[in-house]
Amino acid sequence: LRSEVLSVEKDDTGFTLELNGMTVGCEKLVIATGGLSMPGLGASPFGYKIAEQFGLNVLPTRAGLVPFTLHKPLLEELQVLAGVAVPSVITAENGTVFRENLLFTHRGLSGPAVLQISSYWQPGEFVSINLLPDVDLETFLNEQRNAHPNQSLKNTLAVHLPKRLVERLQQLGQIPDVSLKQLNVRDQQALISTLTDWRVQPNGTEGYRTAEVTLGGVDTNELSSRTMEARKVPGLYFIGEVMDVTGWLGGYNFQWAWSSAWACAQDLIAVRGQ
């Protein structure tokens, strides 16, 4: 344990591992080294290097389930909202949609909605955010205008949105400082677009430092789906996040690690019993 593996070689009898100050041999070798997420916990590209050494295809990696960072102008406008969370529907350019909470942070946007969509977002793309997924905003505004024409638009929106968010959007000129009866059709349509189709182009993500998973990795086509053994290299197995398998939030990535380990173990047990 806690020994660095310096090299791995294979011959007809199995594998030879050079460690710090010692050599270890084995018939079967299981790579369970994870991805690149959270390097502070010891993440490294070791598993990918082993796969490439033995001729297996490794797909490009990037951070997944990770917060977005924002371009400086937008970030400076929204930093005061750090800690504010709202229900949302967020849509990627490829059409993937998640309905989860969105969280404003000092660095950009986070929360389950953003973490989920980050795995489907590509640099340079926009995401569309609906901050009022449970409200037909046009109908709501028209009904409130008929019932309370002198009520301020700000207070009306605060029924469904956090007060801090409404106040900040008004300061930024996104919400007119008017009463409901003063809200004209053009401004109402612009407001509806702002709150239900807020298009944001992230500057990037927070990267592997805070990512919960790594996208990409050892190509699953290189491995047996039943045993996790490399098709080209008998006796070499890959399990867990080192593979190109990524799940949603909710324990799916843990389950993949456990399930792939179980499948591998069943094969090792069967081989040993022969």
Predicted regions: what they are:
Residues 14-18, 25-28:
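Acidic, glycine-enriched active-site microenvironments
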Residues 5, 23-43, 51-52, 102-107, ...:
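Short hydrophobic core segments
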Residues 35-54, 245-273:
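A conserved FAD-binding loop/helix module that cradles the flavin
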Residues 37-39, 67-68, 105, 109-112, ...:
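Glycine-rich phosphate/pyrophosphate-binding beta-alpha loops
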Residues 56-60, 66-186:
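An anion/pyrophosphate-binding glycine-rich loop and adjacent beta-alpha core
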Residues 1-14:
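A conserved short coil-to-beta-strand element within the FAD-binding core of flavoproteins
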